[in-house]
Amino acid sequence: MVQITKNIIVNGFANKPMGTDIFFKNDGLQKPVCIYAHGFNGFKDWANFDIIAERFATAGFVFIKFNFSHNGTTPEQPETFSDLEAFGNNNYTIQLEDLGHIIDWVCSSDNPYQFIIDTENISLIGHSMGGGISIIKTAEDSRIKNLVTWASISECKTPWGNWPDEKMNEWRRTGVEYYINGRTNQHMPLHYQLYQDYRLHEERLNIRHAISSIQVPVLICHSNLDAAVPVINAYHLAKWQPAAKMFVVESDHVFGRIHPWTWDYLPKAMEDVLMQTIKFLS
């Protein structure tokens, strides 16, 4: 039976709380741990992600998912973008620090579940923007022993990478642009600090250099019909890390899921990616 504890508070960047979930079979045996990093405009429970988390736990892993400190949700409202000021002040280096805090917590005596975790066997799984964050963190942190990307970006320019010069100039002039959430119709603020953070840390945020330097096993999963992060990004990653394994399915950016997800099963594309990931990590 899978033991589930949801919305544990782990402090992230500037001590901002991150709701964190843990799933595992409590049979007294230490297990490898998978840490999942969600993407831009996402959150840990998107599309009933508990289904996926339970599957990992059933397969013998400790599975941990969390909300980045500045993703716009709060521990009290983990599935609602109620803190738009935090969302607008999010950036890649904040998320790297957040993920570092989660890894530290996993390995810390402050973690009441450490008894079940093999801290010598930590894997990162990152979706979309979270994939890019996971690539960089894997390159930086020797505690990470495996990396899996799902529909990952190949450069840290989400969502402004394809904006025309006029929009970039307006962003610099006003200090804020807005991203429209297609599901909630919210106008999500993006403060210019996002671009400034990228320019200030451009060398660190170079995904090509990061993935090229990784010495641990890598699995790259992507959909060939992904409109948000086209599959060419996966081929870039595979070119830069020739030792990586690659798995491509025919689906969209989220492998056929939607939010809310009210069913107790996964769409075929997500099921296939899940099974490939479990096989790779086992």
Predicted feature descriptions by range:
Residues 1-29:
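N-terminal cap/lid segment of alpha/beta-hydrolase-fold proteins
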Residues 27-73, 77:
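Short, surface-exposed "cap/lid" segments of acyl-processing enzymes
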Residues 49, 216, 229-239:
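Short alpha-helix in the alpha/beta-hydrolase fold that links the catalytic acid
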Residues 85-113:
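Alpha/beta-hydrolase active-site loop
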Residues 104-168:
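Primarily recognizes the serine-hydrolase "nucleophile elbow" in alpha/beta-hydrolase
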Residues 213-215, 219-222, 226:
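Short beta-strand/loop motif that positions the catalytic acidic residue
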Residues 225-229, 253:
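Acidic catalytic loop of the alpha/beta-hydrolase fold
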Residues 251, 255-282:
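Catalytic active-site module of serine/aspartate enzymes centered on a nucleophile-bearing elbow/loop
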